[in-house]
Amino acid sequence: MLQPSRRKYRKEQKGRNTGLATRGTKVSFGDFGLKAIARGRLTARQIESARRAMTRHIKRGGRIWIRIFPDKPISKKPAEVRMGNGKGNPEYWVAEIQPGKVLYEMDGVDEALAREAFRLAAAKLPLETVFVTRQVG
């Protein structure tokens, strides 16, 4: 699963996920893409699960690019622990997603196959997504 190899600080504040994506909004590597049209968080497990669904569907046909990376640690206190005594330990990693961000890209397959692969991947994600193609020019 994806996670940073090193970080300056182990824990991060919660923050707020606002605004629209300004970078990574166009299909730039492949011919087809899966774009988020809602905001939210994707865990490393969800990103990997969607990738596996796509890979299984296209078999050895094309190439897949993951355009997002889970770089935010989410901490959690253990079960049945009283409040206080500091922040919990980092439990998992998430990628904060803004509307307009391209999540995955695909190349080397026809549009019908790409559409179906992205449909299977989108079912694994907690965000609303849309199929996009590369704009020439």
Swiss-Prot record:
InterPro entries: Ribosomal_uL16, Ribosomal_uL16_bact-type, Ribosomal_uL16_CS, Ribosomal_uL16_dom, Ribosomal_uL16_sf. GO terms for cellular component: cytosolic large ribosomal subunit. The keyword tRNA-binding applies. Residues 1-22 are annotated as: Disordered. It comes from the Bacteria. GO terms for biological process: translation. Keywords: Ribonucleoprotein, Ribosomal protein, RNA-binding, rRNA-binding, tRNA-binding. Residues 1-13 have a biased composition (Basic residues). GO terms for molecular function: rRNA binding; structural constituent of ribosome; tRNA binding. Binds 23S rRNA and is also seen to make contacts with the A and possibly P site tRNAs. Belongs to the universal ribosomal protein uL16 family. Part of the 50S ribosomal subunit. This is Large ribosomal subunit protein uL16. It comes from Azoarcus sp. (strain BH72).
